[in-house]
Design a protein with these regions (language model features):
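Alpha-helical transmembrane anchor segments
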Residues: 133-225
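Short alpha-helical basic/polar micro-motif
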Residues: 2, 15, 129, 189
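Structured inter-helical modules in multipass membrane proteins
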Residues: 27-141
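A residue-level signal for conserved active-site and pocket-lining positions in enzyme catalytic cores
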Residues: 17, 57, 191
Length: 232
């Protein structure tokens, strides 16, 4: 149960990250106006930061120092900077927050939208913190050892509780029960850290791809042109 709770909590944390990134992209696209090429390039970079954030979270949780996956969305200078910092996702949010703050200072975003953007960034940090807590707080070793010993004692004592009339079939019954219990214990151990590369871990690569597609789609949105009242 503890392992599954950790797995499900990790999935909810990533769900929070996905929702927050979608909200950020949506609000940025609709609420931050662009008047020239320079402003568009700045906004485009902010969208790239949104795509890079979940990739950085994935690499951070897997303790993978390679920034090659980030190179498609960040400049070489930015990747070099991330090589020097201990927490790449946090640093990406600093770049993102700097862009948003400049939009607020230039009064391109009203106070309500500014609050929404700031809250979404905070939600990203909370999702990251939840994932870090899961990774850095493994199940106590005493709990793991006790569980193994409990299963072993149960399997040894199980034949004493079965009827002697079962004969040799008792061996198959005990073997089947032992197989099931040990399988459950192994599964619990495997999903204890749901952010790895095992087949039963969370599909972080797929989640990152989904976020990239969503942010790209939102960044390409153009509001429809409605006819003016004079043309009707």
């Amino acid at each position: 149960n503890n392992s599954y709770d950790r797995y499900w909590e990790g999935r909810k944390a990533w769900g929070q990250i996905v929702i927050s990134l979608r909200n950020l992209a949506r609000t940025m696209q609709v609420s931050i106006p662009v008047h020239n090429e320079q402003e568009w390039q700045q906004k485009k970079r902010a969208f790239q930061l949104l795509i890079a954030f979940p990739i950085a979270v994935k690499l951070h949780l897997r303790q993978n120092p390679d920034n090659q996956e980030l190179a498609d969305f960040l400049t070489p200078a930015e990747c070099a900077t991330l090589d020097q910092v201990p927490n790449r996702p946090i640093y990406i949010t600093l770049w993102l927050q700097d862009y948003l703050q400049k939009q607020m200072d230039c009064q391109r975003v009203d106070s309500n939208r500014a609050w929404e953007l700031d809250d979404s960034v905070n939600q990203l940090i909370q999702g990251l913190a939840t994932c870090e807590r899961i990774v850095h707080t493994p199940l106590p070793m005493a709990y793991v050892i006790y569980l193994k010993q409990l299963i072993l004692v149960y399997c040894i004592a199980l034949p004493l509780g079965l009827k002697p009339e079962l004969g040799w079939s008792m061996v198959f019954i005990v073997g089947m029960v032992a197989f099931i219990l040990m399988g459950v214990e192994e599964l619990a151990r495997e999903i204890e850290n749901p952010f790895g590369l095992d087949v039963n871990d969370l599909p972080l690569d797929d989640l990152c791809t989904t976020i990239r597609r969503n942010v790209t789609m939102i960044s390409q949105f153009q509001p429809p042109l409605f006819p003016s009242t004079d043309d009707r």
